Amino acid sequence: MRYAVYLAPPPASRFWQLGSAWLGRDAWLNRPVALPSGWSAADADRVAAAARYGWHATLRAPFALAEGASEAAVHATLRTLARRFATFGLTLAPATLNGFAALRPVSGQSQVAELATAALLALDALAAPAPLRTGLSAREAELCRRWGYPYVFECYRCHFTLTSQLDEVDIPSWLARAAAHFDGALYQPVEGLALFVEPEAGAAFRLCRLVWLLMAGSTSMRTETGQLIYVMGPSGAGKDSLLGYARERLAGQPLVFAHRYITRPATAGSENHVALSEAEFALREAHGCFALSWRRNGLAYGLGCEVTDWLAAGLVVVVNGSRAALPQARQCFPGLKPLWITASPAVLAARLAARGRESADDIAARLAASAGFRPPADCRVLCNDGELAVAGDELVAWLSSHCHQPITAL
């Protein structure tokens, strides 16, 4: 297994979609995407080598872990490094580099080089020695022996690779093609460090983590850019069944379903949650391990801080919330979109009675609480009275509308 630290835009961004379409592969979803319209098989061959690495510009070239090093240590190092740098802008243009086409900086090169050098030094103790390359200058060979990569320090050259080696006669047409393809997207903010992983030798690299830099002019890290979907509903409405239905059908979309942390056994109920004792929950809550927490019906519920990381990565995050905690949730996630899943009182009563977990008085109390709730004006309402697939397909369509659509032809 090898790791690499790259410049890469968030997966939901237009620049990522354009770059992935150019290469014919999305390294976040780890799947092929359609190449631009009109490309030939020979054109596809020209980008195949770059596609294995995903859309990126190198900061720290691929490295294996040194003995005793761990992926967790790499994550921690990147988080520390990210707090030393603020976001900045990068203006790119199609150009050639050693005979291949690339997007190269017109401005911002010195800031990228500084970031690349810092990444190289910070990760040095975690990287195993790399094999020496051939065909290098004396200085490049010296750098490769010491740092595992020849293009560092004064030899560093920031670029987003577009093709493999080109015949000189083909270069102008490829540069023109790139200028048209990336038109309107050649100024990019550099917002974070992207950790890519090669699971095994020769495998395609995958984007596995984005670590955000400080916001320009601030001492704060970047906050949410994705979309949080806050799902509510009375007991018996079938929330868990509907979320499970949608989860199966939306695999591969830039959308995640957050597990809840709950003080009840893992075997209780139909929800796939993380079971905690009261003491464990209180400890995590006291140490800020939850992005949001609340109490209801004698249980404690929490959403982990990973939710904010997923939002910062530009993902759609679906959480199973509580109507009582909605005001608190809005404070934590101002841009959330609420969804109220419900059913008719008769259906709710029948479902609650069938599961046999509540007494008749408990059922009556739950129905009364549900009847008293008025969804806010910005809340999507979904009625789950009939077959699961009916409301399920409606939910899938609504959630899909919040996901970016991969570019299939340009």
Curated annotation (Swiss-Prot):
Coiled coil segments of this chain: none
Residues the record lists as binding ATP: 233-240
Pathway(s) per entry: Metabolic intermediate biosynthesis; 5-phospho-alpha-D-ribose 1-diphosphate biosynthesis; 5-phospho-alpha-D-ribose 1-diphosphate from D-ribose 5-phosphate (route II): step 3/3
Keyword Iron-sulfur: no
Transmembrane segments: none
Classification via SUPFAM superfamilies: P-loop containing nucleoside triphosphate hydrolases
EC number of the protein: 2.7.4.23
Keyword Repressor: no
Domain of life: Bacteria
Region (unknown): 1-220
Molecular function (Gene Ontology), one example: ATP binding
InterPro entries: DUF1045, GK/Ca_channel_bsu, P-loop_NTPase, PhnN
Keywords: ATP-binding, Nucleotide-binding, Transferase
Pfam families in the record: DUF1045 (PF06299)
Catalyzed chemical reaction(s): alpha-D-ribose 1,5-bisphosphate + ATP = 5-phospho-alpha-D-ribose 1-diphosphate + ADP
Ribose 1,5-bisphosphokinase as annotated region, ranges: 221-410
GO biological process, one term: organic phosphonate metabolic process
Gene3D superfamilies to which the protein is assigned, alphabetical: P-loop containing nucleotide triphosphate hydrolases
Role description: Catalyzes the phosphorylation of ribose 1,5-bisphosphate to 5-phospho-D-ribosyl alpha-1-diphosphate (PRPP).
Family under the similarity heading: In the C-terminal section; belongs to the ribose 1,5-bisphosphokinase family.
Protein name (database record): Ribose 1,5-bisphosphate phosphokinase PhnN
Native source species: Laribacter hongkongensis (strain HLHK9)
